Swiss-Prot record:
It comes from Argiope aurantia (Black-and-yellow garden spider). Its cofactor is Zn(2+). Signal peptide: none annotated. This is Astacin-like peptidase p18. Its EC number is 3.4.24.-. GO terms for molecular function: metal ion binding; metalloendopeptidase activity. Keywords: Hydrolase, Metal-binding, Metalloprotease, Protease, Zinc. It is an enzyme of class 3 (hydrolase). Active against casein. Has a role as a digestive enzyme.
Length: 20
């Protein structure tokens, strides 16, 4: 549910994460 280079919005909000 996260795109490399973008922010992980679920379940977190505006958290810089790089997950597949």
């Amino acid at each position: 549910n996260a795109i490399p280079g973008n922010y992980y919005r679920w379940p977190y909000a505006k958290v810089p994460y790089v997950i597949d």
